[in-house]
Design a protein with these regions (language model features):
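A feature for the membrane-embedded catalytic helix bundles of lipid/isoprenoid biosynthetic enzymes
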Residues: 2-17, 87-196
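N-terminal membrane topogenic signal
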Residues: 8, 24-29
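Cytosolic juxtamembrane amphipathic/interface segments immediately preceding
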Residues: 14-26
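Helix-capping/transition residues at the boundaries of transmembrane alpha-helices
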Residues: 20-22, 45, 71-72, 134, ...
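Helix-loop junctions at the membrane-solvent interface of multi-pass transporters
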Residues: 24, 44-48, 99, 159-160
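Ser/Thr-centric signal marking residues that sit
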Residues: 28-31, 178
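Membrane-embedded alpha-helical segments that form the functional core of polytopic membrane enzymes
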Residues: 31-80, 110-121, 163-174
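Membrane-interface alpha-helices at helix entry/exit sites of multi-pass transporters
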Residues: 81-86
Length: 196
C-alpha cells in the first residue's frame, strides 16, 4: 500500500538527496547510518525509552529510504548495493523486534513475547519468499504488509506503548496474510512454467 508513495517521496526528497551527494555521502553510508541508528533505537526501546526510541527508529527508517534514491540520482545503483541494503534491512528489522522480545521476557509479558517472536518470523519469511522467488522469476511488490507498512506499524506501537499488544497482533495477522499472498502468487507464477 505505502509503496505507491515511493514516486512522490523520491521527488519530495530530491533536494535532501542532492545535498547529501554534494557532501559526498554514498548509498552505502546511508545504509550503515540507518542500521546503526536502528541499533541505538533498539537499545532505547529495550530500556523502555519509548518516545526517543520510536522517534529515532522512524527517523533512521526514513533515512534508510533515501539510499536507493541517492544511488539512482548519482548513477551509482548496482545489484550489490541493493543486495547489501536488503541484508542490512533484515538486521534492522530483527534488532527492533528483538528489543521488544527481550523487553517482554524481562518484564514477564508472555503475550508480547510470543507475538513479537511470531512477528519476527513473519517479517523474515515474507522477505525470504520474495528473495527466493526472484531467483527464478520477476516477483514484484506483493502483499498486505510490506516493509514500509511494517515500519509504520512498529513506529506507532512503540510511540504509544499502551497499544503495543494491538500493534503486534496487526503485525502477526497481517504478516501471515502477506506470507499466504506471496506463496499463492509464487505458485501462480511458477505453475505455468511447470507445464512448459
Amino acid at each position: 500500500m505505502i509503496h505507491i508513495l515511493k514516486g512522490p517521496f523520491e521527488k519530495a526528497s530530491r533536494p535532501l538527496v542532492d545535498l547529501l551527494i554534494r557532501h559526498h555521502y554514498t548509498a552505502f553510508h546511508l545504509t550503515m547510518i540507518a542500521f546503526f541508528g536502528t541499533l541505538l533505537a533498539s537499545i532505547l526501546i529495550y530500556y523502555q525509552n519509548w518516545i526517543i526510541g520510536s522517534s529515532l527508529f522512524m527517523f533512521f527508517s526514513l533515512f534508510d529510504a533515501l539510499d536507493g534514491s541517492l544511488a539512482r540520482r548519482n548513477n551509482s545503483a548496482k545489484p550489490i548495493g541493493a543486495f547489501f541494503d536488503s541484508v542490512m534491512d533484515r538486521f534492522s528489522d530483527s534488532a527492533i523486534l528483538f528489543a521488544i522480545i527481550f523487553y517482554a521476557f524481562n518484564t514477564g509479558k508472555r503475550n508480547i513475547f510470543l507475538l513479537a517472536l511470531l512477528a519476527l518470523i513473519a517479517s523474515l519469511i515474507t522477505s525470504y519468499i520474495k528473495a527466493k522467488a526472484e531467483n527464478f522469476l520477476e516477483f514484484g511488490s506483493i502483499g498486505l504488509l510490506q516493509r514500509p507498512e511494517r515500519v509504520l506499524i512498529i513506529f506507532l506501537m512503540l510511540l504509544f506503548p499502551n497499544y503495543l499488544l494491538l500493534g503486534l497482533w496487526v503485525l502477526v495477522i497481517g504478516g501471515y496474510i502477506t506470507i499466504c499472498q506471496r506463496l499463492y502468487s509464487a505458485y501462480q507464477k511458477f505453475n505455468p512454467q511447470s507445464f512448459s
